[in-house]
């Protein structure tokens, strides 16, 4: 997986766009069975790789998108979609347990059972490791990540309307860490690398699109950035209520999931968000004056 994604969590970011699209085609009644079999195989392989990443972002994105899709489809027409939703959820759960067994198998290759009992990880431990650690400030990389978010937020609060300026905010970040935060190993590494390589080569971004835009452009810049997305989400919800169309549900969830990516990384990681935004505007404006 690292040969494709240098950061395993990016697998979850790309899932934000791909999973709603796969669900849309799996739910399409007009597709022939061979096409659905190939698509179902691809879906199974993709979520198998998500589970193999052992990345919190990938797990959280998959769980969140799946819950949104299930809720959206059942509210749209639960009688029509109940059986296939249960089938897809069952397949996903089965693949999760298969991935746990596969991880145990890979981890124990080369370990002699005569010398030492091979370590095993349970499904509960996998869930706790990758989802239970999301909120804890002292869990895994959360300490440095939260410190970075707080530093950018403090910076933004000094100039809440207009911010510090695009690209300038990354240069000032190290000055907004508190003393205790500078003792974090991750923060120490960032500051050390910036001192060594310089600001241009090693800027310290916020790992959060929205906090970074707030620190750079203030509330005015952040509001201007979010307005097109807010408008299109409102129009898609309006279309779903009016036309009860599965396509709009999948598109709405894809846009929401892609926006969630910005809460844990830069939106430039998933350029597909801009394609989704353009597609959404084409769908909404293409309805004509009668909507």
Name each model feature, range by range:
Residues 58-62, 265-277:
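Loop-to-transmembrane alpha-helix initiation sites
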Residues 2-18, 206-209, 214-221, 267-271:
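Membrane-interface micro-motifs in multi-pass membrane enzymes
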Residues 73-137, 153-158, 166, 180-181:
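A membrane-periplasm/extracellular boundary helix in multi-pass inner-membrane enzymes
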Residues 14, 57, 165-167, 220-223:
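Gly/Ser/Thr-rich beta-alpha loop segments that engage phosphate groups in nucleotides
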Residues 29-33, 81, 85, 237-252, ...:
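A juxtamembrane structural motif centered on a specific transmembrane helix
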Residues 37-46, 200, 204-208, 215-217, ...:
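Loop-to-helix entry and N-terminal half of a specific, functionally important transmembrane alpha helix
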């Amino acid at each position: 997986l690292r040969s494709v994604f240098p950061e395993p969590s990016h697998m979850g970011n790309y899932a934000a766009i791909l999973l709603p699209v796969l669900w849309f085609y799996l739910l399409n009644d007009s597709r022939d069975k061979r096409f659905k079999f190939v698509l179902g195989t691809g879906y199974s392989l993709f979520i198998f790789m998500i589970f193999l990443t052992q990345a919190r972002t990938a797990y959280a994105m998959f769980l969140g998108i799946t819950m949104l899709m299930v809720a959206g489809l059942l509210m749209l027409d639960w009688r029509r979609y109940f059986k296939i939703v249960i089938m897809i959820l069952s397949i996903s759960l089965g693949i999760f347990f298969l991935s746990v067994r596969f991880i145990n198998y890979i981890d124990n290759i080369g370990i002699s059972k005569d010398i030492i009992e091979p370590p095993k990880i349970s499904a509960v431990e996998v869930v706790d490791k990758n989802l239970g650690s999301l909120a804890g400030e002292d869990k895994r990389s959360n300490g440095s990540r939260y410190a970075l978010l707080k530093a950018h937020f403090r910076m933004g609060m000094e100039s809440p309307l207009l911010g510090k300026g695009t690209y300038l905010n990354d240069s000032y970040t190290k000055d907004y860490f508190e003393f205790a935060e500078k003792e974090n190993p991750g923060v120490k590494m960032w500051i050390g690398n910036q001192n060594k390589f310089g600001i241009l080569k090693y800027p310290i971004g916020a790992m959060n699109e929205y906090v970074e835009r707030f620190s750079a452009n203030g509330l005015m810049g952040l509001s201007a950035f979010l307005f097109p997305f807010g408008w299109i989400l409102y129009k898609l919800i309006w279309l779903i209520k009016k036309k009860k169309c599965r396509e709009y549900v999948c598109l709405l969830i894809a846009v929401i999931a892609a926006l969630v990516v910005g809460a844990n990384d830069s939106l430039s990681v998933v350029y597909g968000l801009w394609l989704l935004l353009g597609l959404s505007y084409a769908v909404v404006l293409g309805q004509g004056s009668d909507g």
